[in-house]
Design a protein with these regions (language model features):
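Phosphate-binding Walker
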Residues: 160-163, 169-176, 202
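Conserved P-loop NTPase motor core of helicases/translocases
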Residues: 84, 135, 179, 187-279, ...
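Pre-Walker A (Motif I) flank of P-loop NTPase domains
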Residues: 156-162, 187-188
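Accessory interdomain/linker segments of ATP-dependent helicases and helicase-like nucleic-acid enzymes
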Residues: 1-49, 425-427, 431, 437, ...
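Beta-strand cores of modular interaction/reader domains in eukaryotic scaffold and signaling proteins
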Residues: 34-36, 42-44, 62-64, 72-74, ...
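Walker A/P-loop NTP-binding motif
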Residues: 171-185, 206-208, 298
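Conserved helicase motor core of SF1/SF2 NTP-dependent helicases
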Residues: 184-188, 196-198, 262-264, 270, ...
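Pre-ATPase regulatory/linker segments immediately N-terminal to the P-loop/RecA-like helicase/translocase core
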Residues: 29-151, 155, 208, 213, ...
Length: 564
């Protein structure tokens, strides 16, 4: 609350019109907002304490940009009458929730129940996935890992699972090679999906690097799409079409369709227009089963499966799907479901199929083991603790650099906040992070790149805002543009240097920090794994050692750092 509108640009001349409300914060006490760009919000006038969403006109939208003094909001519905948002009024912004995901999951369950028996049996592990063994000689002669993976994906007749640990190139190389392999068949139709829009941007980046160029259409919104790929958005691709027949032909003739799972789920008519030979789904371990069922069980106008086979790419040792229920609430106790590997509703389809495949030593899965991101010393803990030492450095220049003059891994102890202070902020860590950021900037002044050099991870939005405030006080403009965010937002990205602020002030917070799973008796902290594997060259950690040492994995990490 406490935002005053200073400019209304609310046009009503069509869907493409700007629908942005700009506002500036009043000069009140310092606040730490827990909003970020792209968040779904509701906006309403709030000039009295009694004003709220139940007695004021509510507008829905998304945050287009957010600065220290200004918020830009893109309204979902164009307003033709500017007087509904008077410039002299005060406004409140609250987080909004979307029921689209829940609706699509219910629809997905219905589509599954009405799917062909053969597809239902496959997804319920009532029949094993089939594999074309005629390609075995080519697979055995593969010149590199990515060619082998692509050929195995081609040979799989039902599904193929690819485990891609951090830095192994599962999107930039493996997915790209699969697309090239499938696209070589002149008639092949390919559907490419991921969970987040940022990951879809990465898929588009991989597609754009293919030579000769491939034609693709992206399903999604402009706000959620990187500017470089907005020309491929379906609304732009179809803007020149004047007749439905032209729309039909454009979609039919484009052999690659790209989008998030949510975007494609919201366009079921796509499967009545096109039949896909393969669907390749990245970030599959972050997607719950009901979110995928509607797509994998879709049927075309002829009643046949709209998708012949699918490839799931992910890493069950990195972050899973985000759900509100705890493990006990989502546990499965039905014997028939347990018999097919469905043990918990929080698990992804990828995890269940992977467990079933490994139990039968089946060939419909593979794992990438050569990583080109982290220096071996940076990767040491995660490689030993979570991957059994199987990750091998590719040997890129930054991976073979000497560590004689550079600190690869360091811990900076902080102190907890005083009782009565919010548990979700730590001023000493914010100052440590800002000081480290300034030193890193000085070390890289000539080649500092805010999108590549430095990133900062911390678990709470309040701590994010505090760190940004401390960094802004340094007066270094380039540092104001670096990414400071939660570990969930960092999955899939990398930086030369990562700073991780644990922000633990009380023992009970340790449970929130972890996301535990177990494989072959080994305890794996998926959040810690992601945080430690974002850095290419250096990893710096700050936290309260007395509290962190209460967690066995964190204690082992601190012990390893001491040995450097």
């Amino acid at each position: 609350t406490g935002d005053k509108a200073i400019g209304n640009d609310i046009l009503g001349n069509g869907a493409s019109a700007s629908k942005t409300v700009r506002s500036e914060a009043l000069e009140t006490e310092t606040s730490l907002p827990n909003f970020r760009q792209g968040d779904a919000i509701i906006l309403y006038e709030r000039n009295r304490d009694t004003d709220n969403v139940t007695n004021k006109m509510v507008f829905k939208g998304n945050i287009e940009y957010l600065t220290e003094n200004e918020i830009g909001i893109r309204l979902r519905a164009t307003q033709q009458n500017p007087s509904v948002l008077p410039a002299e009024s005060l406004y409140a912004i609250e987080h909004d929730t979307m029921d689209t995901t829940f609706r699509s999951m219910y629809q997905g369950l219905y589509i599954y129940l009405s799917a062909r028996k053969e597809r239902r049996d496959l997804l319920l592990s009532q029949r094993p996935p089939r594999f074309d063994e005629s390609l075995d000689p080519m697979i055995s002669r593969s010149e590199d890992d990515f060619t082998r993976i692509a050929l195995k994906a081609k040979a799989a007749q039902d599904y193929f699972l690819l485990i891609g640990p951090p830095g192994t190139g599962k999107t930039s190389c493996a997915l790209k090679k699969m697309v090239e392999t499938f696209h070589a068949d002149k008639d092949a139709q390919i559907l490419l999906l991921s969970y987040t829009n940022r990951a879809v941007d990465e898929i588009c980046k991989s597609l754009a690097s293919i030579a000769p160029a491939v034609d693709f259409i992206r399903v999604g919104s402009e706000l959620s799409c990187d500017e470089a790929y907005r020309g491929h958005l379906i609304e732009n691709e179809l803007s020149s079409c004047n007749r439905r027949s032209e729309v039909y032909e454009r979609i039919r003739n484009c052999r690659i369709i790209v989008g998030t799972v949510a975007a494609i789920s919201g366009k079921p008519e796509l499967f009545r227009l096109k039949h896909f030979d393969v669907a390749i789904i990245d970030e599959a371990t972050q997607i719950l089963e009901p979110q995928l069922l509607g797509i994998l069980c879709a049927r075309g106008e002829d009643g046949k499966d709209a998708i012949d086979k699918f490839v799931l790419i992910g890493d069950h040792k990195q972050l899973p799907a985000v759900v509100q229920q705890n493990t006990e609430q989502s546990a499965i106790y039905d014997e028939s479901l347990l018999s097919i590997g469905l043990t918990n509703l929080k698990d992804s389809l990828f995890e269940r199929l992977y467990r079933n495949c490994t139990a039968t030593v089946h060939r419909s899965y593979d794992m990438l083991c050569r990583q080109g991101r982290m220096h071996p010393e940076v990767a040491l803990f995660a490689n030993r603790a979570f991957y059994g030492g199987r990750l091998i450095p590719v040997g890129l220049p930054h991976q073979i650099e000497s560590s004689d003059t550079i600190c690869r891994l360091a811990f900076y102890p902080s102190v907890p906040e005083k009782a009565g202070t919010s548990a979700k902020i730590n001023y000493s860590e914010a100052r440590i992070v800002a000081d480290l950021a300034a030193r890193i900037y000085e070390d890289h002044r000539t080649d500092f790149d805010e999108s590549r050099t430095l990133g900062i991870i911390t678990p709470y939005r309040s701590q994010i805002a505090l760190i940004k405030k401390e960094i802004e006080s340094l007066g270094i403009p380039a540092l104001n543009r670096i990414l400071v965010d939660t570990v969930e937002r960092f999955q899939g990205s990398e930086r030369d240097v990562i700073i991780y602020s644990f922000c633990v002030n009380y023992p009970y917070q340790l449970k929130f920090l972890s996301n535990l799973t177990e494989e072959e008796g080994v305890l794996i902290d998926r959040k810690l794994n992601v945080a430690l594997t974002r850095a290419r060259k250096q990893m710096f950690i700050t936290g309260v050692p007395e509290l962190l040492e209460r967690n066995p994995l964190y204690k082992s990490l601190l012990k390893l750092i001491e040995s450097f």
